[in-house]
């Protein structure tokens, strides 16, 4: 009787396992299938790809369990995997299309459905490559993009090595919010070739991955495409600070002050670098967060000059580009100012005395004429 019950129990377990897509060799060992139809899809967004899959076989009736998936992916050659655990059947992320992509995924069954321990399926794997055309040397060289004053994006490049004069390059870009990739409409040219792009106003493009592809064409040989990804706030080059001033706080302190650069960047987003010089020799170089700097000084006779430049700080970006230096502002100590005034007033005083003397002579000459005229008539 016990043997019959045991046989019935085993048969029941087998039927349940078959129905739910799992197999069980004991009460604690359950196996689950990996996801189906795992693939990487390129929607034409220059590096922003879709990873998608279908549920494992025979899990449609597993209603009491929430199935999860562990997804790992990376560019081929990268040392680390990105890992995501999700309940969805798709995931999106950006990749470097200059390299291949590899990804793998498996199914996770939670402990509530598996007698107290999580069950993982085997891995399903896939890869994706852009079919390369042309040798690597034909792609653009020295690509450089700058977001000037957080307003205007400009990218420039040099032609590939050994390309012929008929080679021309075209730039395409995309960021989240655009329906499709757009081509540059305002190229910078040199000798008839496109060597850069001036972008239009980029609405709602901050703090998003910005994808660029520069491809090329030539009648003589294929040209290799290049892909670039960055975020605009990390390549901002602001304007330099303005309205530099000095204020003597005490006999041993001078306060340097300036105003934030013109433009849309908030004051809280700036770092500043100051360079202070004494007689063309660098005295101090400092980085500050505010628009003031107090300098300790003991020699009142020296001349001090300073310049300031700005950069977007870590509170508003991960990186940035220093602005150009501001116009130079100089201050002179008291004694030196007196000497300067003396050098100015000495020649001016001499000229003033000379003018007074000559004026006096001219005013005295008319007084001699009345005496001379009567004497002249008396002699006749």
From Swiss-Prot:
It is a single-pass type I membrane protein. It is found in: Cell membrane. GO terms for biological process: cytokine-mediated signaling pathway; immunoglobulin mediated immune response; interleukin-13-mediated signaling pathway; negative regulation of immunoglobulin production; negative regulation of mast cell degranulation; positive regulation of cell population proliferation. One of its GO terms (cellular component) is extracellular region. Residues 364-380 are cytoplasmic. Its main location: membrane. Cleaved by MMP8 leading to a soluble form that is also able to interact with IL13. The keyword Transmembrane helix applies. Glycans are attached at residues 115, 215, 290, 299. It comes from the Eukaryota. Gene3D superfamilies: Immunoglobulins (2.60.40.10). One of its GO terms (molecular function) is cytokine receptor activity. The chain crosses the membrane at residues 344-363. Residues 34-134, 139-235, 240-333 form the Fibronectin type-III domain. The keyword Membrane applies. Induction: Expression is induced by STAT6 and NF-kappa-B. A motif (WSXWS motif) lies at residues 322-326. Residues 1-26 form the signal peptide. InterPro entries: FN3_dom, FN3_sf, Ig-like_fold, Short_hematopoietin_rcpt_2_CS, TypeI_recpt_CBD. Disulfide bonds join 65-113, 145-155, 184-197, 269-316. Residues 27-343 are extracellular. The WSXWS motif appears to be necessary for proper protein folding and thereby efficient intracellular transport and cell-surface receptor binding. The cytoplasmic domain functions as an inhibitor of IL-4 or IL-13-dependent activation of the Jak-Stat pathway. Belongs to the type I cytokine receptor family. Type 5 subfamily. Cell surface receptor that plays a role in the regulation of IL-13-mediated responses. Functions as a decoy receptor that inhibits IL-13- and IL-4-mediated signal transduction via the JAK-STAT pathway and thereby modulates immune responses and inflammation. Serves as a functional signaling receptor for IL-13 in an alternative pathway involving AP-1 ultimately leading to the production of TGFB1. Interacts with IL4RA. Interacts with high affinity to interleukin-13 (IL13), but not to interleukin-4 (IL4). This is Interleukin-13 receptor subunit alpha-2. It comes from Homo sapiens. The lineage of its organism: Eukaryota, Metazoa, Chordata, Craniata, Vertebrata. The gene is IL13RA2.
């Amino acid at each position: 009787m016990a043997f019959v019950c045991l046989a019935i129990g085993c048969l029941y377990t087998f039927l349940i396992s078959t129905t739910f897509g799992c197999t069980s060799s004991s009460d604690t060992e359950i196996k689950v299938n990996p996801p189906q139809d795992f693939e990487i899809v390129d929607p034409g967004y220059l590096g922003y790809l879709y990873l998608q899959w279908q549920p494992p076989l025979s899990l449609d009736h597993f209603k009491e369990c929430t199935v999860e998936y562990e997804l790992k992916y990376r560019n081929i050659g990268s040392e680390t995997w990105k890992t995501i655990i999700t309940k969805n059947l798709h995931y999106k992320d950006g990749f470097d299309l200059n390299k291949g992509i590899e990804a793998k995924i498996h199914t996770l069954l939670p402990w509530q459905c598996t007698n107290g321990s999580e069950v993982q399926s085997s891995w399903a794997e896939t890869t994706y490559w852009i079919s390369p055309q042309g040798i690597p040397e034909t792609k653009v060289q020295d690509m450089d993009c700058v977001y000037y004053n957080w307003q205007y994006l400009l990218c420039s490049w040099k032609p590939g090595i050994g390309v012929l004069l008929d080679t021309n390059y075209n730039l395409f870009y995309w960021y989240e919010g655009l329906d499709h990739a757009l081509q540059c409409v305002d190229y910078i040219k040199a000798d008839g070739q496109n060597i850069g792009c001036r972008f239009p106003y980029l609405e709602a493009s901050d703090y998003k991955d910005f994808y660029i592809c520069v491809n090329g064409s030539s009648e003589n040989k294929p040209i290799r495409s290049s892909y670039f990804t960055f975020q605009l706030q990390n390549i901002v080059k602001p304007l330099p600070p303005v309205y530099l001033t000095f204020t003597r706080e005490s006999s041993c302190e001078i306060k340097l002050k300036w105003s934030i650069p013109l433009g849309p960047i908030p004051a809280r987003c700036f770092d500043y670098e100051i360079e202070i010089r004494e007689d063309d020799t660098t005295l101090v170089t400092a980085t500050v967060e505010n628009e003031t700097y107090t300098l300790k000084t003991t020699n009142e006779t020296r001349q001090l000059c300073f310049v300031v430049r700005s950069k977007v700080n870590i509170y508003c970006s991960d990186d940035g580009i220093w602005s150009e230096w501001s116009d130079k502002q100089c201050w002179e100590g008291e004694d030196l100012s007196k000497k300067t005034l003396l050098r100015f007033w000495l020649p001016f005083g001499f000229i003033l005395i000379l003018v007074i003397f000559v004026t006096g002579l001219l005013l005295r000459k008319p007084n001699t004429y009345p005496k001379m005229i009567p004497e002249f008539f008396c002699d006749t």
